């Protein structure tokens, strides 16, 4: 059932991407801002509990509906609900469409669009011009936040898992934006998202190795583990970025232009996704997954 819902969700998401702008869910920003203000009132040492409460409240309706739809009409209502939740969990924007827009702008010399889309992909407010390796790394990080994390938790816990990961990413993005504006940092949100991203990021990295240059990918993985001195939440993003760039290296180098780097990274993301869907299909065929 999950495999059917996953395949349907991915197909519809790709085909109807122009109709799914509601997935940006801007109306959650006010909720997160209010929740952050309340969480800061918790006694010292209990801020993590406050952040968890803010995270789990929007997930409760999905839990209730999932339980209510189980074993009703051969699970057809549950299947429909799972596809809808998955559609709203993938994103907020279609990564392939954004990469295509970035590549077109790079090819035609549209610097304004390159700068705008580059900022979105790299989640930065800086004015620095995107460079090929940074763009490649950003696409691999975004793939984990927008696709692989959602897919992993959907397979693990159905609509509940997908929506939980989606809300954690929305919360992380809003918290980072408010932190850059006000200076009030909430490390608990980044920690929670890092925990949820830990396994998907490594599975995605393995998919990149299978779909690209296997030896270069594992060399990059070993090199990163040897040189890593970053705190835990940041390692999740860095390992998928490092292995992804290693997997798409040509002659030991990442493609030299933004257009080539973005295209190579997105093709690798697509191959890794197909690889894991194939693995899931085989597991389902042999009765090892549902």
Feature roles, as predicted:
Residues 1-290:
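Hydrophobic N-terminal alpha-helices or hydrophobic patches in metabolic proteins across all domains
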């Amino acid at each position: 059932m999950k495999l059917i819902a996953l395949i349907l969700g991915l197909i519809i998401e790709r085909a109807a991407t122009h109709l799914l702008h509601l997935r940006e869910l801007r109306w959650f920003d006010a909720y997160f801002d209010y929740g952050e203000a309340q969480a800061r009132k918790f006694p010292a040492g209990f801020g993590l509990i406050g952040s968890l409460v803010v995270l789990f409240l929007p997930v409760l309706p999905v839990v209730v509906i999932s339980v209510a739809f189980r074993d009703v009409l051969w699970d057809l209502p549950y299947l429909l609900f799972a596809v809808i939740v998955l559609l709203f969990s993938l994103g907020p924007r279609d990564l392939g469409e954004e990469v295509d827009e970035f590549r077109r702008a790079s090819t035609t010399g549209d610097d304004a669009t390159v700068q705008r889309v580059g900022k979105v992909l790299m989640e930065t407010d800086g004015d620095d011009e995107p460079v090929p390796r940074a763009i490649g790394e950003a696409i691999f990080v975004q793939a984990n936040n927008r696709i692989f994390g959602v897919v992993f938790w959907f397979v693990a816990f159905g609509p509940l898992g997908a929506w939980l990961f989606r809300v954690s990413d929305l919360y992380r993005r809003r918290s980072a934006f408010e932190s850059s504006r006000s200076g009030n940092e909430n490390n608990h949100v980044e920690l929670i998202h890092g925990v949820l991203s830990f396994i998907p990021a490594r599975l995605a990295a393995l998919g990149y190795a299978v779909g690209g240059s296997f030896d270069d990918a594992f060399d990059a993985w070993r090199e990163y583990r040897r040189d890593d001195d970053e705190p835990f939440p940041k390692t999740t993003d860095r390992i998928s970025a490092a292995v992804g760039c290693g997997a798409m290296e040509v002659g030991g180098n990442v493609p030299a232009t933004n257009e080539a780097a973005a295209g190579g990274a997105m093709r690798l993301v697509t191959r890794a996704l197909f690889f894991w869907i194939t693995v899931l299909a085989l597991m389902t065929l042999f009765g090892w997954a549902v």
